[in-house]
Amino acid sequence: VESNISYAELVEQRYALEASLMKATEQGDVVKALESWVKLHNSVKFLNHLRLGQTLEAARISAAVTRTVIRIGAMHAGIPPVVNDHISAVSSTIIRNAHSIDEINQEHERLIREYCQTIRRKKTTGYSSLTISALYYLEHSYAQAVTVQNMANELEVSPNYLIAQFKKEVGITPL
């Protein structure tokens, strides 16, 4: 594939698209984030063919870069590190276990949607990082036996502080 665009221009374009994806994610704008991801994905397609070929390994490498860009956007949006790390780790496992490039691309979309939903929830609720982390923990641990002690350990706070803060913000205790 030949192009009239110089390598430097392609790199600048890719960085601009990564910044656009990061900003859209930070704002919780799923439509713009998905549009940015598609543009970014399409902008590097020909590079994949030139350098690595369109392989599963190349798609996994691309996914790691994209996940990092999205995670930084979420960090800038104030998503607590424990939530950010959990979302990212789940995605990493899905990517590692993917058997096709299509599965990896579907995971990109799922990841963007999950991050944007989490960011929008943070923006609209006004809850503290601790309460958002506790809510996220509860939502994603429903299949396990959840205790206040386990949740407090995961969030690195005392059980009493977790209960008091959660009740102050939400109006009920976490469990």
Question: Where are these predicted regions, by residue range?
Answer:
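Short acidic alpha-helical/loop segments enriched in Asp/Glu that coordinate divalent cations
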Residues: 81-86, 126, 147-149
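Residue-level marker of regulatory loop/turn positions in helix-turn-helix DNA-binding domains and
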Residues: 13, 55, 123, 127, ...
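Sequence-level signature for long, low-complexity tracts enriched in small/hydrophobic residues
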Residues: 116-123
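Hydrophobic, helix-rich cores of sensory/ligand-binding and other regulatory modules
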Residues: 1-115
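Hydrophobic residues on short alpha-helical segments
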Residues: 22, 132-139
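Generic structural marker for isolated residues within well-ordered, non-membrane alpha-helices
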Residues: 70, 91, 135, 148, ...
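Basic/polar phosphate-binding segments, predominantly the helix-turn-helix DNA-binding elements
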Residues: 122, 139-141, 145-175
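N-terminal positioning helix adjacent to the helix-turn-helix/winged-helix DNA-binding module
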Residues: 126-134, 170
